[in-house]
């Protein structure tokens, strides 16, 4: 019998490998992305102090609506970049969370770059 590969388990292993190499500091925090089947979340994290500095998702009250999941991801990217600039954060380290840099993750990253975040 063929065993089915658990994609989320593989993603978590990949994410653990990446997280061992990158971490966010006060001067350059980590932009973390989490993607579920319906929603997308982004957090800017200072790993040294263990604090979330800014966050956004498509479940936020000031999000509005989006036509597609990729469109929602780009709006979340704009929102997290706006909230980061309000707190004086301009430069971050991008943590794609073990996901491929494609689709929703790419849309979020590009929208955040266009709205002033550098990575």
Curated annotation (Swiss-Prot):
Domain of life: Bacteria
Statement: the UniProt record of this protein carries the keyword Transmembrane helix: no
Keyword Ribonucleoprotein: yes
UniProt GO cellular component terms: cytosolic large ribosomal subunit
One GO molecular-function entry: 5S rRNA binding
Basic residues: bias regions: 9-20
One of the protein's GO biological processes: translation
A Pfam entry, by short name: Ribosomal_L18p
InterPro entries listed in its UniProt record: Ribosomal_uL18_bac-type (IPR004389), Ribosomal_uL18_bac/euk (IPR005484)
Gene3D superfamilies in alphabetical order: 3.30.420.100
Keywords, comma-separated and alphabetical: Ribonucleoprotein, Ribosomal protein, RNA-binding, rRNA-binding
Chain positions covered by the region annotation Disordered: 1-25
Subunit (UniProt): Part of the 50S ribosomal subunit; part of the 5S rRNA/L5/L18/L25 subcomplex. Contacts the 5S and 23S rRNAs.
Role noted for this protein: This is one of the proteins that bind and probably mediate the attachment of the 5S RNA into the large ribosomal subunit, where it forms part of the central protuberance.
Family: Belongs to the universal ribosomal protein uL18 family.
Protein name: Large ribosomal subunit protein uL18
Organism: Listeria monocytogenes serovar 1/2a (strain ATCC BAA-679 / EGD-e)
């Amino acid at each position: 019998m063929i065993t089915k590969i658990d994609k989320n388990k593989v993603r978590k292993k990949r994410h653990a490998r990446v997280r061992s190499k990158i971490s966010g500091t006060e001067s350059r925090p980590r932009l973390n992305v989490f993607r579920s089947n319906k929603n997308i979340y982004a957090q800017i994290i200072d790993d040294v102090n263990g604090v979330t500095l800014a966050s956004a998702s498509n479940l936020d009250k000031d999000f509005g609506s989006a036509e597609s999941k990729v469109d929602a991801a780009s709006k979340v990217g704009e929102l997290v970049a706006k909230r980061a600039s309000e707190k004086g954060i301009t430069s971050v380290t991008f943590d794609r969370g073990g996901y491929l840099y494609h689709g929703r993750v790419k849309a979020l990253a590009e929208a955040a770059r266009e709205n002033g975040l550098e990575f």
